[in-house]
Amino acid sequence: MITRGEQWGVPTTRTHADIVVNGDRDLASRPKDIRLIVKAGDIAHSLGDPVNPLIGAECIEVPIDALRVNISLRDGSSVSLLASSHVMIGHWLRGRFICVNNSGFIGKRNISPRAHPNDGFFDVMSLQPSMRLQQRVLARH
């Protein structure tokens, strides 16, 4: 977990064993015991969209939190999701909407500016069905 003012991550060198992943879904689907290089997606964006290091190049290895979300459905069944960046339930513009977020970003939108992918916390945004469209648009930006 990060602490204000402390260095986050450790200097390392890219090896042949490191695997490049192309986004948040790809990142979440990989085993946790291998080193991954995130090339795109919301996690990469929250890390400043780093350049893919060449084999043998120096880089920083950073741990990130993972989200495991269990969703209970109306029919009594449940769904379990593993994600690296966010899980969204519902629709931004109508009805109830819940977003559990790790990176702070959804695309180019920084919906949780204080989020950090290794702070041990997940940011939650909840929009109630009674919210008007204008309020939802403001919450989205």
Predicted regions and their residues:
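Catalytic core of DAGKc-family lipid kinases
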Residues: 1-105, 111, 118
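ATP/nucleoside-binding phosphotransfer catalytic cores, i.e., glycine-rich phosphate-binding loops
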Residues: 92, 126-141
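Short helix/loop capping segments that flank catalytic or ligand/cofactor-binding pockets
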Residues: 107-109, 134-135
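Folded interaction domains in cell-surface recognition and envelope-stress signaling
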Residues: 114-117, 130
